[in-house]
């Protein structure tokens, strides 16, 4: 269903922004597009091509951004469904993808002056070109103040101040999502479901924050291809950290196994139940 936002707030502009200063700029560009008779189906692209900040510090409640609204919707679903029967709830968050938008309180968890930029920001000796990219995704996030340039190796070169701000934004966005997951977990506890619900937290890729002079994903370095995976089963008393590779295709057979369902024979993935129990390393 449609997401709901707190009283006084509308859907974030361009899907991202709630900061009043940014909203004013976006409105001005939109009015210019209308005055220039831009096709209304292309107005958002017209705006994004001219103004799309890579981060935003919002003096807003959690629910004003889409991820807070998604968390609230998930909590509403848990209140409405019949949880006496088995249920499956998939919750997909946008952050910490770009742009790094989050309420101010999550930015204030970190001191930007103490943030360290990546120590190694150049192309490795004898590295293959295909492993690198120009960080086109990052370059698509623009404001009049931000100037992107490429170094002699064709890699994105950002000044230290902007790098620290982006890393700060990544941290803030990650903490924002952590808090939304916490809210859903609290609802499970409130409904007495925390002791019989399997929870999986995973990301779809890693992220470069200036290392190798790379930003975003889109590389074949482990920094981009490795993603987090946390599986919680309340029946398992001890946690294990697994260092051997797993794959996304392992999730379905793992959940089937943990739910005592038959695992289809035609799957490429493998159940990780043994690893979760500490039986397999």
Model segments located where?
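His/Cys-centered metal/cofactor-coordination and adjacent catalytic loops
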Residues: 1
């Amino acid at each position: 269903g449609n997401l709901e936002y707190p009283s006084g707030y509308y859907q974030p502009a361009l899907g991202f922004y709630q900061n009043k200063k940014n909203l004013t700029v976006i409105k001005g560009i939109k009015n210019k597009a209308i005055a220039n008779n831009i096709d209304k189906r292309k107005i958002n692209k017209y705006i994004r091509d001219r103004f799309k900040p890579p981060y935003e510090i919002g003096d807003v409640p959690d629910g004003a951004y889409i991820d807070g609204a998604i968390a609230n919707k998930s909590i509403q679903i848990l209140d409405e469904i019949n949880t006496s029967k088995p249920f499956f709830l998939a919750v997909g968050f946008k952050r910490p993808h770009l742009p790094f938008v989050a309420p101010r309180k999550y930015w204030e968890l970190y001191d930007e002056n103490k943030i360290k930029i990546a120590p190694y920001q150049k192309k490795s000796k004898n590295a293959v070109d295909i492993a690198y990219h120009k960080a086109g995704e990052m370059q698509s996030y623009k404001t009049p103040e931000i100037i992107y340039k490429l170094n002699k190796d064709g890699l994105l070169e950002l000044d230290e101040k902007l790098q620290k701000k982006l890393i700060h934004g990544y941290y803030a966005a990650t903490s924002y999502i952590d808090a939304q997951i916490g809210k859903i977990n609290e609802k499970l506890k409130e409904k007495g479901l925390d002791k019989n619900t399997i929870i999986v937290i995973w990301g779809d890729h890693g992220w470069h924050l200036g290392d190798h002079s790379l930003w975003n994903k889109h590389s074949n370095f482990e920094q981009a291809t490795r993603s987090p995976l946390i599986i919680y089963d309340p029946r398992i008393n001890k946690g294990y950290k697994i260092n051997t590779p797993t794959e996304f295709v392992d999730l379905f057979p793992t959940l089937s196994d943990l739910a005592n369902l038959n695992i289809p024979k035609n799957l490429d993935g493998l159940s990780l139940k043994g690893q979760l129990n500490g039986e397999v390393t």
